[in-house]
Amino acid sequence: METCRCPLSYLISFLLFLSHSETACRPLGKRPCRMQAFRIWDVNQKTFYLRNNQLVAGYLQGSNTKLEEKLDVVPVEPHAVFLGIHGGKLCLACVKSGDETRLQLEAVNITDLSKNKDQDKRFTFILSDSGPTTSFESAACPGWFLCTALEADRPVSLTNRPEEAMMVTKFYFQKE
């Protein structure tokens, strides 16, 4: 009988990381929280990479696999995290300007962020588990979810229509 490595094992690893890291982070303390790197890919197997200072999702093969960005994760609350790349030096942020809501990378050190600051709310994402996958909802813009397009090599963005077939809002993780 052939054994299958289930994505559920990745989710369990991620949840164990969160529960362990929560004890390492004091909600009101100044002690830095523990950051860990994870591989992230959507349910269509697209991974994240940086192109022209923009986070995109696509199918990396051969020598291009080295371009894959690991997602740096710092837990804020039991189901909330800060997300970054490049060793936590670039953080994912939800920015609202007028009627437009967009995802952008900001040059901020992920371990300098604090859940007690209102200004850092734009960097906070709420985790929602659905079986072996996880979705990320913006804390600053409720109802807006991290997503990838169905087409490869498109920017990682946000959508307020997670059920829409044109956007993918479910992701897998693998602890590095």
From Swiss-Prot:
Q: Does the keyword Secreted apply?
A: yes
Give the subcellular location: Secreted
- Give the record's keywords alphabetically: Disulfide bond, Glycoprotein, Secreted, Signal
Q: Which GO terms describe its cellular component?
A: centrosome; cytosol; extracellular space; nucleoplasm; vesicle
Disulfide bonds, paired cysteine numbers: C91-C141
Keyword Acetylation attributed: no
Q: What processes does the entry annotate via GO biological process terms?
A: immune response; inflammatory response; insulin secretion; lipid metabolic process; negative regulation of heterotypic cell-cell adhesion; negative regulation of interleukin-1-mediated signaling pathway; response to glucocorticoid
Name the domain of life this protein comes from.
Answer: Eukaryota
**Which stretch is the leader sequence?**
1-25
Q: Which function does this protein serve?
A: Anti-inflammatory antagonist of interleukin-1 family of proinflammatory cytokines such as interleukin-1beta/IL1B and interleukin-1alpha/IL1A. Protects from immune dysregulation and uncontrolled systemic inflammation triggered by IL1 for a range of innate stimulatory agents such as pathogens.
PANTHER family named in the record: INTERLEUKIN-1 FAMILY MEMBER, INTERLEUKIN-1 RECEPTOR ANTAGONIST PROTEIN
User: What family does the Swiss-Prot or TrEMBL record give for this protein?
Assistant: Belongs to the IL-1 family.
Q: What is this protein called?
A: Interleukin-1 receptor antagonist protein
Q: Species lineage, top-down?
A: Eukaryota, Metazoa, Chordata, Craniata, Vertebrata
